[in-house]
Design a protein with these regions (language model features):
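A short acidic, amphipathic alpha-helical/loop segment
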Residues: 11, 57-64, 84
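Short glycine-rich, flexible loops that bind phosphorylated cofactors or substrates
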Residues: 54-56, 102
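A short, aliphatic-rich alpha-helical micro-motif
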Residues: 40-41
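Adenosine-cofactor binding site in Rossmann-like domains, unifying the SAM/SAH pocket
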Residues: 23-37
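C-terminal functional extensions of proteins
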Residues: 71-141
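Internal active-site segments that recognize and position negatively charged phosphoryl groups
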Residues: 1-20
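Short beta-strand/loop segments at the ligand-binding rim of alpha/beta enzyme cores
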Residues: 17-20, 64-74
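Structural motif
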Residues: 1, 45-49, 73
Length: 141
């Protein structure tokens, strides 16, 4: 389960059953986001963009993922590296941090689309108990 249509998300479909919850559907994997209450309970893994924090859907989506006992990861440049998300069921945050403030400032001012490399560095912050295995038994939602 992916919440938010990431670039190259279709590559996940090569390895797993893919459902993408998306506000602006644009291809065969996309499902309108109001369907979240029907599809998240069936998910083993939920990857959601940090945009869910911005558009105020994160609280509801994280609650559904917790109820489903799904492994949940907040991803993307908009993912806030905030350990407080761990209390909401997020197991890892895969985002970015500013590595070079001047290069970042220049890239933002000039409208550069690619900031990774010298300006931003990708990183992963894991919850202290992130490797705890969650198992569902037959019949559990």
């Amino acid at each position: 389960m992916v919440i938010g249509h990431f670039p190259r998300v279709e590559r996940i479909a090569e390895h797993a059953q893919l459902t993408v919850l998306e506000r602006n559907c644009r291809d065969e994997w996309d499902t309108p986001d109001p369907a979240c209450e029907y599809v998240i309970p069936e998910a083993d893994y939920v990857f959601m963009t940090g945009v869910t924090l911005i558009n105020k859907t994160a609280t509801r989506l994280l609650r559904l993922a917790q109820e489903a006992q799904a492994h949940t990861v907040m991803v993307g440049p908009s993912a806030v590296m905030a350990p407080a998300l761990f209390a909401r069921g997020v197991e890892a945050i895969a985002g970015s941090i500013v590595a070079d403030p001047e290069a970042t400032r220049f890239a933002v001012k000039s409208g550069a689309g690619k900031l990774f490399g010298s300006a931003l560095q990708m990183c992963v912050l894991e919850a202290p108990d992130a490797h705890t295995t969650r198992k569902r038994t037959a019949g559990e939602a």
